[in-house]
Amino acid sequence: MKANTMFIILCLTLSTLCVSSQFTSVLGKIFVTNRAVKSSSYEKYPFDLSKEDGAQPYFMTPRLRFYPIGKRAAGGMEQSEGQNPETKSHSWRERSVLTPSLLSLGESLESGISKRISINQD
């Protein structure tokens, strides 16, 4: 009797929460249903920090950027990325300059191992 009463109270509580709540549970995570991804006035931050709709800070949504596929396929994307200071660090040309090659990583690993062996032998 007591278990049935508790089960009924639990079901009623959950149903009222689901109806009155603004949140939706998707794969165990909570998302705000009435909050859309929009550009913020803080262009240098990767997250939408504006609280115009009263969203809490822990529900901040990352901004999404969409680029035309044809422009990217034609090769015009790199030129526009180089001019935009926000996407300049994400340019593939700059990444290729800053990223060490596998050959140089292998050489530095070999030299580090040989130095460690020579230190251990002394």
Curated annotation (Swiss-Prot):
InterPro entries: ELH. Residues 74-95 are annotated as: Disordered. The modification Isoleucine amide is found at I69. The keyword Signal applies. Its main location: secreted. Residues 1-21 form the signal peptide. Residues 22-34, 73-122 form a propeptide. GO terms for cellular component: extracellular region. GO terms for biological process: neuropeptide signaling pathway. Pfam families: ELH. It is found in: Secreted. One of its GO terms (molecular function) is hormone activity. Keywords: Amidation, Cleavage on pair of basic residues, Neuropeptide, Secreted, Signal. Belongs to the molluscan ELH family. The atrial gland peptide A and peptide B precursors are the source of the 2 peptides that, upon release from this reproductive system gland, initiate the egg-laying process by exciting the bag cell neurons. These neurons, clustered in neural connectives near the abdominal ganglion, in turn release other peptides that act directly on the ganglion and also, via the circulating hemolymph, on many other organs to control the physiological processes of egg-laying. One of these other peptides is the egg-laying hormone. This is Atrial gland peptide B.
